[in-house]
């Protein structure tokens, strides 16, 4: 765990394409954005305790999108904390187990990048443990201290979040810095045209810090770098 800005902490390591989760302290409450993998819940709880807090202080868990590396730890964390679970309504049916995630298919745009991940997921995938969504959120809503942006493209219900006081953007998988800096993972983006529109919208925020779904956060020249993706 590292502090990205006052009251903003980054969790995650090298697993799952260097997937990241973000823990916010605000108004005496904790908000978690994404939950890492199925067996990462204990690590998130340890991070909460290292802040001098208790699991019950986690009031809300917000999901950027319903892909395994971002919601895997949700069931364990919901059980341990009782936190309210929030996601976009399109993703809610996947999180709750009523519908499978939409696939890039057997003929993805970048097969040599996609197939190894698909094989790895197939060989190592535990069964998704469904968790009902407590509240659907969308564009213009608030999730604790965060402003919600609907940024479809990578998935239809993909959300990003903005913390105005630090000009901090959480892009989810709309932007990645691992294995390279790029507009998300193109091989896994379902609608490139929507994704391009979403990138333009995020670039207009002129964020000073960008926390991404996979890879290290962008802390220098963040606004210029995001504009360069548009």
Feature roles, as predicted:
Residues 47, 73, 198-201, 229:
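A general structural detector for well-ordered alpha-helical segments in enzyme core domains, enriched
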Residues 3, 36-39, 92-152, 190, 194-207, ...:
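Metallo-beta-lactamase
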Residues 1-51, 160-172:
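Conserved beta-strand hairpin/beta-sheet module of binuclear metal-dependent hydrolase folds
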């Amino acid at each position: 765990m590292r502090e990205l800005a006052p009251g903003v902490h980054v969790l995650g390591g090298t697993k799952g394409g260097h997937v990241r989760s973000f823990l916010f302290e605000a108004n005496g409450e904790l908000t978690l954005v994404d939950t890492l993998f199925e067996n990462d819940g204990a690590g998130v709880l340890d991070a909460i305790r290292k802040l001098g807090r208790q699991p019950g202080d986690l009031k809300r868990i917000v999901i950027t999108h319903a892909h395994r590396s971002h919601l895997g730890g949700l069931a364990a964390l919901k059980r341990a904390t009782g936190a309210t679970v929030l996601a976009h309504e399109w993703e809610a049916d996947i999180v709750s187990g009523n519908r499978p995630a939409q696939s890039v298919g057997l003929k993805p745009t970048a097969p040599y990048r996609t197939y190894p991940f698909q094989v790895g997921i197939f060989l190592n995938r535990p069964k998704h443990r469904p968790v009902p969504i407590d509240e659907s959120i969308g564009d213009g809503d608030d999730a604790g201290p965060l402003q919600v942006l609907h940024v479809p493209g990578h998935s239809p219900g993909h959300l990003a979040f903005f913390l105005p006081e630090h000009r901090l953007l959480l892009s989810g998988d709309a932007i990645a810095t691992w294995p390279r800096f790029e507009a998300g993972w193109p091989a896994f983006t379902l609608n490139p045209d929507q994704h391009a529109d979403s990138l333009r919208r995020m670039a207009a925020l002129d964020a000073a810090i960008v926390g991404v779904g996979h890879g290290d956060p962008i802390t220098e020249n963040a606004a210029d770098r995001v504009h360069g993706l548009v």
